[in-house]
Amino acid sequence: MCIYASRQTVCPYLTPFKVKRPKSREMNSSDVNFSLLQSQPNVPAEFFWPEKDVAPSEGDLDLPIIDLSGFLNGNEAETQLAAKAVKKACMAHGTFLVVNHGFKSGLAEKALEISSLFFGLSKDEKLRAYRIPGNISGYTAGHSQRFSSNLPWNETLTLAFKKGPPHVVEDFLTSRLGNHRQEIGQVFQEFCDAMNGLVMDLMELLGISMGLKDRTYYRRFFEDGSGIFRCNYYPPCKQPEKALGVGPHNDPTAITVLLQDDVVGLEVFAAGSWQTVRPRPGALVVNVGDTFMALSNGNYRSCYHRAVVNKEKVRRSLVFFSCPREDKIIVPPPELVEGEEASRKYPDFTWAQLQKFTQSGYRVDNTTLHNFSSWLVSNSDKKST
């Protein structure tokens, strides 16, 4: 679950992390064809990851299952129990499961079905929705238009979301794929609307879990925000011990809500090892991202995670990343700073700044927020001298 960018920046204003781009690339999205790659005896070396990144899982992660029905129905006792479990998970590793989340019956299953429909289209038809460099929305295969090594073994369809009207998800897909594929856009639009509504509820529950006097603080903070929706398709891989569907990373966004199919693949780094998050029928995975870690003043942990692949089965997941309004200052509630500016863990920043950092040649990992914060402080010091 990742907003991709490269491990080191080539953005001109991020001079501490400048690197030299390769002069040429072996592949790009127009020529990465996983159907053909699967027929080859070996996986191309561009898809190999370092040994430390592909270290095997050491077991299953026992995540709390948060039943949202009490919170959604206004039951204060059940809400407080849910908030307590959320707090414990977010302080430990930044992830938990939610059930009884209020989605319309059958919507999640239909969205997964539609994702299979899209990824089952011909390569030429999928490329009609090709992601233009610099844009959020579009289709990619292996992200080879951006990277030359450590490529993810996946195809993705990423769509920018903003609460409408207009219906930006549906409009983008219909404009690219044509009216005869209108159902794809309609279902994904409905699913994104439901995900966004759930995010607002989760933001309030997070505020309660932190003991904020104004329990709606985070809900209101994100009311005018946006989202990024991503469909992931992980084909079978002949050398899963060397490849990854998505490399180890923390999401730079606020919180991430993930729908898995029934194939194992999501792993979280917790208590010093990689641990598997097994799919559970009816449950959604919620991960804390870097932006919310900053909004919590470091009290809640950004979830470090990855996606592994296997030899036999296709795996699908649908992911919704929540983002604040681009120009809104990311600053924790005053009560989390204990009245002392010196206790601030991260400097003020905007989502636009962090997004530019992660989209300008920096591959997100578990040091993104630290590196970004260091650059902000360094740049501020230079301006003041």
Swiss-Prot record:
Protein's UniProt name: Gibberellin 20 oxidase 5
Chain's gene name: GA20OX5
Protein origin, superkingdom: Eukaryota
Organism for this UniProt entry: Arabidopsis thaliana (Mouse-ear cress)
Keyword entries, A-Z: Iron, Metal-binding, Oxidoreductase
One GO MF term: metal ion binding
Residues annotated as domain Fe2OG dioxygenase: 224-324
Alphabetized Pfam families for the sequence: 2OG-FeII_Oxy, DIOX_N
Residues of the active site: 315
